[in-house]
Amino acid sequence: MTTALDQLKQYTTVVADTGDFQQLAQYKPQDATTNPSLILKAVQKDAYRPILEKTVRDHAGESAGFIIDRLLIAFGTEILKLIPGRVSTEVDARLSFDTQRSIDKGREIIKLYEAAGVGRERVLIKLASTWEGIRAAEVLQREGIRCNMTLLFSLVQAAACAEAGAQLISPFVGRIYDWYKKQKGADWDEAQDGGANDPGVQSVRRIYTYYKHFGYRTEVMGASFRTTSQITELAGCDLLTISPELLQKLHDSTEAVARKLSPDEARDARLERVAIDESSFRFQLNDDAMATEKLAEGIRLFSADAVKLEKMIEALR
């Protein structure tokens, strides 16, 4: 029997969301994504501790931030040995509201990859989908540095990223699901509120439809999944980035997977363009309590994990 994972690959490019690159060969993803939290998780494992220790040792006199950048590149280059496509490497979330420093950091990451023999076409620079992050992506894209816009929870963020010419966006599913489930509390009914009605699934479907309807070339990569049903409900999305745990569940399943998203259907939809000048962007994002709260929370969490990583580095000196 064909596995659910193999069926999904007929409609969608499968991406592995992990810093644990030893698991990649098993699932044969096209691309891989990382973030500070995933790298922090990986370096706490015995298998990856030597990478951290060597990076600290090789750059003993440098700042923790300098070492983190080299650590990200060390993981990225190892990942690229195991996949045919691209790896996403994230700009420090503490720069999420600083356009120029985000641009500088994106350029620096690409230079480090190129110095390691990796072409920029194999790297996506991850930036938070703040107004400032989107403006940074606009500049980097013009320089041939491709960007992956993360912490994306709303259509207005997606529309602004597309207008800026971002290579790819990563709209989150699971974190949207979490927010609405918490809001409903005891009234949440998984049978009624999950599946195709899952708010996170609906958000990605809405963004995908908007992009295909208006002919944007920016790729849509659904991210942050809690269940395999969230994944299979988005079969047909350009890409889906999936944790090793959920990749394993899809690999072990033979449940039928049908295409759910289609560019042809999207082109026939009746839609209006979203206003994405700065004041309209900020107002629409502010008007969406879920997106506002989850964007802020995501930046805080990624920033906190960057600080934890810095402390680990300092402890090894």
UniProtKB/Swiss-Prot annotation:
Transaldolase is important for the balance of metabolites in the pentose-phosphate pathway. It catalyses: D-sedoheptulose 7-phosphate + D-glyceraldehyde 3-phosphate = D-erythrose 4-phosphate + beta-D-fructose 6-phosphate. It holds the Pfam family TAL_FSA. The active site is at K126 (schiff-base intermediate with substrate). The keyword Transferase applies. Disulfide bonds: none annotated. GO terms for biological process: carbohydrate metabolic process; pentose-phosphate shunt, non-oxidative branch. Keywords: Cytoplasm, Pentose shunt, Schiff base, Transferase. One of its GO terms (cellular component) is cytoplasm. The gene is tal. Its main location: cytoplasm. NCBIfam families: talAB. InterPro entries: Aldolase_TIM, TAL/FSA, Transaldolase_1, Transaldolase_AS. The keyword tRNA-binding does not apply. One of its GO terms (molecular function) is transaldolase activity. It is an enzyme of class 2 (transferase). Belongs to the transaldolase family. Type 1 subfamily. It is found in: Cytoplasm. This is Transaldolase. Its EC number is 2.2.1.2. Homodimer. Pathway: Carbohydrate degradation; pentose phosphate pathway; D-glyceraldehyde 3-phosphate and beta-D-fructose 6-phosphate from D-ribose 5-phosphate and D-xylulose 5-phosphate (non-oxidative stage): step 2/3.
